[in-house]
């Protein structure tokens, strides 16, 4: 509800229907960069004081039923639980407006400690999200996936060429796969091994 004060005393209260916090997801409410983020019935919402806006369309059709979240400068951390009880650790970059699926870490709580975001896991581990505490991890496999490219432009154009620019660490391997027309069959179309100073 919004209250519109008037000098003459005829204040108005206007009810605006919008998506609120999902029942049972109250622990997903967190503030990052002055914006309130939370899990609603059909996705993660950002509320900056005007109207809530769904910011999780890029995560696809998967629906989450609850979880725990924490906010820090530039990031909204969400340990989300789906209907099957599976957990995913999701991170929303508030500056670039990008989602990152980290892993299946089941968080119990998020807290800021000495200026760093820490995660208390259900197995008792305490993780540091900045990488300044503890020991550095070794190399690991990861992936990045775009949405459909070119299909939703006014001209419905298909891409004839796609260029990726990246800087791979020395000794690393990058492989590129494509999926045509949503058939869910991924084909490797290229790859490169990282060398020092190469982009």
Label each region the model flagged.
Residues 1-17:
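Surface-exposed extracellular loop regions of Gram-negative outer-membrane beta-barrel proteins
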Residues 21-35, 41-199:
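Beta-sheet repeat architectures centered on beta-propellers
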